[in-house]
């Protein structure tokens, strides 16, 4: 059984195909089904009227210094960004910190 079903969202999958309204199932943190009818789960989230899309990778940021006090790189998560690239302007404090190497 799935842990979570996100029901009725407008699904934009990032492939370039037309968005479609449907359900997405998740089990153990992994997407197991997209747009299949009859999905069930322990928890169902009603996403009608909302858009569901993959996380965005921001390849040009200026978070280099900010990451030393704001590991969440806010406000990126509120805008759908799940991964940021730093150091692309020749300045990267975060990369040199031993405590941050797991995130690099």
PLM regions and their residue ranges:
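Histidine-rich, glycine-flanked metal-binding segment
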Residues: 1-5, 10-55
């Amino acid at each position: 059984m799935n842990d979570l079903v996100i029901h009725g969202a407008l699904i934009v999958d990032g492939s370039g195909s037309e968005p479609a309204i449907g359900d997405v199932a998740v089990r153990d943190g992994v997407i197991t089904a997209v747009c299949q009818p009859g999905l069930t789960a322990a928890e169902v989230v009603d996403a009608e009227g909302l858009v569901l899309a993959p996380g965005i990778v921001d390849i040009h940021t200026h978070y280099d210094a900010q990451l030393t006090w704001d590991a969440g790189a806010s406000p990126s998560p509120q805008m759908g960004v799940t991964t940021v690239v730093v150091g692309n302007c020749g300045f990267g404090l975060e990369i040199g910190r031993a405590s941050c190497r797991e995130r690099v």
